[in-house]
Each structure stands twice: as structure tokens, then as C-alpha cells.
Amino acid sequence: WAQAHPRRLSYPAPPDFLGTTFLKQALIELSRDPDVLQEAVQSDSQFARVTEPLWAYLDDLHPHLWREGRDFPKSGPAQVQMLNDGVLDLALSFYPSQASGLIQDGRLPESARTFVFDSGMIGNTHFVAIPYNAAHKAGAMVVANFLMSPEAQAHKAKPDVWGDQTVLDVGELASDKRQLFADIDRGKATLSPSELGPTLLEPHPTWMTRIEQAWQKRYGS
């Protein structure tokens, strides 16, 4: 696609989390043994061997990118602005409803749409934590339980609120709670949960750290 549409693609420069996730997604897709990415990096030689296909891919890809891969968007919002300005044809996001929200806000054209890879995409889940020495643990637990409630999760999923996917298995909820999610107008650019496809596991954090460092040495300005 990049060859057929030169200068119309880019990704945020790592360590921006979207840019780093693009690298991790590519590494999973290109790896001969993706399971090894679930364990910590064992050695410099292992890292070089496992990531060699990634660097070969990027070396081939970058000449076809915006500014021939010599410069990159500084952040996800910067890339979205470039998409809205017609500079790029694609932007990256962790939020399935982000495009619909941006259309509603007038920050993307009505024609913008969301797509995912058939093989799956890296996904994240938000977490809340209560410190061991929290002064008000009981109150914190009440808040955490509320955030996990179907009512709060459905409210968060509305594009004009946050547009974030629920962490709940909607199929396991009572019918009246499932209806909370069914009633959400997700927007014209939002894929349904079934259309999002499989979620790929994040690599072990040591791969992220090493990949960001190696990318900066190879391609950083």
C-alpha cells in the first residue's frame, strides 16, 4: 500500500506510545516465533536475531513514507491533524470510537472510517490500582467497583464521553445491562465489537524498551 501511495503514510515517532505500538504490531506480524515476545529479552544476540525482520521491513518501508521517513509526526494528535489536513491517508488510534468522535467534533471529515487487520491488533485495557498504603482503601474500592459497573462502562463507551471499549463481557450481563450497550450510538466510523477481530497480546515490556532505543539509533533525528 505504501508503495502504491507514496508519501501518504507515516507513524508517530517513538517513544510516542502509538508509534511504539506500530513497531510492536509489525514485530509480531513479522516474527518467526511470536511466542518468544511474551518473555523478557534474554540477550543482545537474541534481540538482534528476533528484531532483524522488523528493521529490514522498516528499511524498505521508510522511503515510501511522508518525507521519505526522514521525519515523523510527533504524536497521535499531530498525525490526526495531518489526516484532517489531507497530508496523510491514515492515522493510528487505540480507541475504536475515536474517529466517530473526531467527526462529531469537526476534526475529521465525514468520510473518515476505522479499519483493523484481519490477523488482529494489539489491544490495551485500562486499570485502576489501590496503593498498599492508601489512606482510604474502602472508599477507593467503592470507586473501583463503580468504574467496573455496566452503567459506568456503558457511559464511558459513548463517543461524546470517551468512546472507549468496555472491559466487560457484555454477553455475560443480564439483558437490561446488555441493552445499555446496545443503545449506544457508536457513530458511523466505529466498528462493532465483533468487527474488531482478535486482540493480540502485548510483548513483554523489555521488548518495548529495547525497540524504542534501537529505533532511535537507526532512524531518530
Stretches with model-predicted labels:
Residues 11-13, 129-132, 198-202:
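Active-site rim elements
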Residues 17, 21-25, 49, 53-60, ...:
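Extracytoplasmic/secreted proteins, especially bacterial periplasmic and envelope-associated proteins
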Residues 121, 126, 130-195:
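Mature extracytoplasmic/periplasmic domains
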